[in-house]
């Protein structure tokens, strides 16, 4: 009889664990609450022919060659360099802020002064962080840092997180880059690609294995019970000793027994437009008075040729409420929330066959390549733990 495994959630974390266990000979029951696979990577085609990302734009970028090679088993890629503009003082400028942004927003004499001083103070750097500028002893450099902080970061962050910037984790602020040059790429990774047929076919191929049985539109928690006294997981009323791979919310798995983990969510508003293109870049950020944070135009990413048709997406940040209409997107990083997650993590360790992987299970924001890498690592750990169980 084949060894049994259960995977909960079929985004990247769950789908990769399902595939890896299936290839190792496990019979995998993969349960997904949504009506589709792919998690937040899900991509579909609208009536006008434009492929869109249902849960906001996703771009594959990495310095991890092994991650690219792994995903290449399930898709081919085409080169794509992501560029983002921000609307500041009525003008569209590159984000991250760079020398082109400086030239666009300041008089020539002032812009030249800023650029000269930046190159003089950071001669061997192509990127610096906003905190380095704000706290720099040179008043001109600190003044530029304050301008960027106020016009690029403060209001955007307040909208994104629903709180004043003073309450946002300082690690978020410290990571805001400023480019010392005219490089307008949003990412600096060595590999920047998009899947030729979109993201959804990756998951279709990844999950197309005879050892994987998928169930969609099903809440795994209707069939799973936790026996804390016996430290066992029950499935359909019977103890289940095989791996249980959780990529869904860890607080939901434990019935919110320690309270819900807070997230920010997004209200996604798609608009079909009867024009060739709506904006000059795939993403334009709106860091000031608008209620939405950014507008995405997907044709810039998919490279589709559809004259007279395009689709845009406006993202409105909102609070997340468990059981509501909207999905959890961004874990809210602060000591109180992290302590609550650590308590859930301690609870999970009572169950030796329970494995947590992914943004919702680990209460941690992951870039795409990082969650692929993490899922492969957790899969190796599972196979090691169950190596003698054959």
Predicted regions and their residues:
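Glycine-rich FAD pyrophosphate-binding loop
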Residues: 22-45
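Short catalytic/ligand-binding loop motif for oxyanion handling, primarily in non-cytosolic enzymes
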Residues: 38-40, 86-89, 94-96, 103, ...
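C-terminal segments that line or cap access tunnels to active or ligand-binding sites in enzymes
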Residues: 242-243, 251-389
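Short hydrophobic core segments
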Residues: 7-8, 31, 238-251
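Active-site/ligand-binding neighborhood in enzyme catalytic cores
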Residues: 91-93, 100-242
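Short, well-ordered alpha-helices that flank and scaffold nucleotide-derived cofactor binding pockets
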Residues: 19, 23, 43, 208, ...
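Dinucleotide-binding Rossmann-like beta1-alpha1 core, especially the glycine-rich loop
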Residues: 48-121
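N-terminal Rossmann-like FAD-binding beta1-loop-alpha1 element of flavoenzymes
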Residues: 3-30
């Amino acid at each position: 009889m084949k060894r049994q495994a259960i995977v909960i959630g079929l985004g990247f974390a769950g789908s990769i664990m399902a595939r890896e266990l299936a290839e190792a000979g496990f019979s995998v029951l993969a349960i997904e609450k949504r009506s589709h696979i792919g998690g937040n990577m899900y991509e579909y085609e609208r009536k006008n022919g434009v492929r869109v990302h249902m849960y906001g734009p996703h771009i594959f970028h990495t310095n991890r060659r092994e991650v690219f090679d792994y995903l290449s088993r399930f898709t081919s890629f085409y080169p794509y360099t992501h560029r983002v503009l921000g609307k500041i003082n009525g003008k569209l400028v590159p984000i991250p802020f760079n020398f082109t942004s400086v030239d666009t927003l300041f008089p020539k004499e002032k812009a030249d002064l800023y650029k000269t001083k930046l190159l003089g103070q950071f001669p061997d750097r192509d990127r610096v962080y906003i905190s380095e500028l704000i706290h720099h002893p040179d008043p001109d450099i600190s003044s530029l840092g304050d301008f960027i902080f106020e016009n690029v970061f403060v209001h955007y962050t307040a909208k994104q997180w629903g709180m004043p910037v003073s309450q946002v984790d300082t690690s978020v602020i410290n990571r805001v880059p400023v480019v010392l040059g005219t490089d307008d790429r949003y990412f600096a990774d060595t590999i920047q690609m998009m899947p030729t047929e979109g993201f959804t076919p990756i998951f279709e191929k990844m999950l197309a294995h005879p050892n994987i049985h998928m169930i969609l539109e099903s809440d795994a928690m209707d069939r799973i019970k936790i026996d804390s006294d016996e430290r066992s997981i029950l499935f359909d009323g019977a103890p289940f000793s095989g791996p249980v791979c959780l990529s869904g919310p860890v607080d939901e798995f434990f019935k919110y027994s320690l309270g819900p983990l807070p997230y920010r969510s997004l209200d996604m508003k798609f608009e079909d437009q009867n024009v060739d293109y709506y904006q000059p870049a795939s993403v334009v950020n709106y860091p000031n008075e608008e209620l939405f944070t950014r507008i995405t135009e997907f044709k810039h990413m998919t490279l589709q040729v559809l004259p007279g048709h395009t689709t845009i997406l406006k993202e409105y940040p909102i609070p997340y409420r468990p059981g509501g209409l909207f999905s959890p997107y961004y874990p809210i990083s602060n000591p109180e929330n992290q302590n609550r997650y650590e308590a859930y993590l301690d609870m999970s360790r009572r169950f030796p066959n329970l494995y947590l992987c992914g943004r919702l299970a680990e209460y941690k924001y992951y870039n795409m390549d990082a969650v692929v890498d993490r899922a492969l690592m957790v899969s190796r750990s599972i196979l090691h733990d169950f190596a003698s169980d054959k």
